[in-house]
Structure formats: C-alpha cells, structure tokens
From Swiss-Prot:
Belongs to the UPF0298 family. HAMAP family: UPF0298. It comes from Streptococcus agalactiae serotype V (strain ATCC BAA-611 / 2603 V/R). Coiled coil: none annotated. Keywords: Cytoplasm. It comes from the Bacteria. This is UPF0298 protein SAG1583.
Length: 81
C-alpha cells in the first residue's frame, strides 16, 4: 500500500457561507471563520488543475499553494550555514 502524496492549499473567500461548496475539491482540514480562509489537501498530481478550477470560482478571493516541497527539511547543521 503506497502513501498518497498530497499538497495543501489555502483558499481565501469573500464570504464564509461559500466554504461548503469547496468540500468536493479535496479534504478541508481547517476553516478560519474570522480570517475567511480554508486549508484544503489535494492529491499532488491534481493540484494544478484543481487550483485553476478553484481560482475561477467567483466567491474565491485568492488561492495560495503550500511551499512545503520547496523548503529544505534537513535541519541538522542549519545553524552553521
């Protein structure tokens, strides 16, 4: 059984009432009602197509992809670089 590679994205909304419309695009991990954004996890191979589709929805203000793949996660010896 292989582990499914997933990537997170932050979706900023104009209104919180539209948050439930995004449940079909991926797994909603967190919904901040005060700051009006959601954190959604999507399969890594589908992230480009899903983010383009979500950006074109009229109730979405902004979509930001997670940068966890770009960050060097080898923390041993980072103080001396």
């Amino acid at each position: 059984m292989n582990k499914q590679e997933r990537l997170g994205m932050s979706v900023y909304l104009y209104y919180n009432r539209d948050a439930r419309k995004l449940y079909k695009y991926g797994d909603v991990h967190y919904h901040s009602r005060r700051l009006r954004y959601l954190v959604i996890y999507v399969n890594k191979e589908d992230i480009v197509s899903v983010s383009k589709e979500i950006k074109h929805l009229k109730f979405v203000k902004d979509v930001r992809l997670s940068a966890i793949d770009d960050i060097d996660q080898d923390f041993v010896g980072n103080l001396y670089r």
